Amino acid sequence: MDNTIPGGINITILIPNLMIIIFGLVGLTGNGIVFWLLGFCLHRNAFSVYILNLALADFFFLLGHIIDSILLLLNVFYPITFLLCFYTIMMVLYIAGLSMLSAISTERCLSVLCPIWYHCHRPEHTSTVMCAVIWVLSLLICILNSYFCGFLNTQYKNENGCLALNFFTAAYLMFLFVVLCLSSLALVARLFCGTGQIKLTRLYVTIILSILVFLLCGLPFGIHWFLLFKIKDDFHVFDLGFYLASVVLTAINSCANPIIYFFVGSFRHRLKHQTLKMVLQNALQDTPETAKIMVEMSRSKSEP
């Protein structure tokens, strides 16, 4: 059976790439709005700094995949060097996004398990410093990997260095996955099974939903890229169907976070009285709903 359409494009390639473009455009809009609001319109706190950087990583990650899908559908051919540089940039953004999500989960877990230490001894600019370290480390890992594996300089390839860096990159990703899963489980266990009662806030829901979506949609891309793709000796030999499916899922993951913020922030609120700024502020709210209602009632009573 012929799976091509007029123009010579295989339908098994056309449909996933169209989905990547559609989800990518939705994600670009959502992450762009989140970045604008957190960067220029809202007061930033410890967690909003991470979310701002996560939105930035997702924005450029989606932009790269949209460009790649458009070039593929238009049958634009480009040098292998361009392709390898593109995948290096995508690697930086993927590692940075995963690191941001792991940092968010870990910080939230520490704030719940060690509240006194967290509120009294945590340095003021920890989030900003951590985000800077994450970006630098992600960039350094990927540049070194590309250099020693001959991506940036095809005339130079160090087999031992390439193998060592591939192993380190895979180990670092596994470490991030483990930290993300353990901190999330500890957070959920403390919320629902702990001795002291901790009331659920919108920030908890936002973080838990973002992590759940990543584990379902973002994880397959990392597994394919760093466990299957790196094992193969030939760059061109890999399962195209699984690769495209993992890219579609990771596009869904990158565009899901703004939707989660909108859903959590607007839940039980009348949308006609809510601006996007207020919705995002509600999604990052770290006070129980009952406490917020009491504060609003006290304010309304004090007004003449």
UniProtKB/Swiss-Prot annotation:
Membrane-crossing segments per the record: 18-38, 54-74, 76-96, 132-152, 167-187, 207-227, 244-264
First-listed, main subcellular location of the protein, grouped into a coarse class: membrane
Extracellular topology ranges: 1-17, 75, 153-166, 228-243
Topology class, membrane: Multi-pass membrane protein
Pfam family, one: 7tm_1
Family annotation (InterPro entries): GPCR_Rhodpsn (IPR000276), GPCR_Rhodpsn_7TM (IPR017452), MRGPCRA (IPR026233), MRGPCRFAMILY (IPR026234)
GO CC terms in record: membrane; plasma membrane
Tissues and organs where the protein is expressed, per its UniProt entry: Expressed in a subset of sensory neurons that includes nociceptors. Expressed in the subclass of non-peptidergic sensory neurons that are IB4(+) and VR1(-).
GO biological process: response to cyclosporin A; response to peptide; sensory perception of itch
Residues carrying sugar: 10
PROSITE patterns, sorted: G_PROTEIN_RECEP_F1_1 (PS00237), G_PROTEIN_RECEP_F1_2 (PS50262)
Topological domain ranges for the Cytoplasmic compartment: 39-53, 97-131, 188-206, 265-304
Gene Ontology molecular-function annotations: GTP binding; neuropeptide receptor activity; pigment binding
UniProt subcellular location: Cell membrane
Domain of life: Eukaryota
Keyword tags: Cell membrane, G-protein coupled receptor, Glycoprotein, Membrane, Receptor, Transducer, Transmembrane, Transmembrane helix
Job of this protein: Orphan receptor activated by a subset of RFamide-family neuropeptides such as FLRF-amide and FMRF-amide. Mediates its action by association with G proteins that activate a phosphatidylinositol-calcium second messenger system. Its effect is mediated by G(q) and G(11) proteins. May regulate the function of nociceptive neurons by modulation of pain perception.
Entry's family note: Belongs to the G-protein coupled receptor 1 family. Mas subfamily.
Protein name (database record): Mas-related G-protein coupled receptor member A1
Species, as recorded: Mus musculus (Mouse)
Originating gene: Mrgpra1
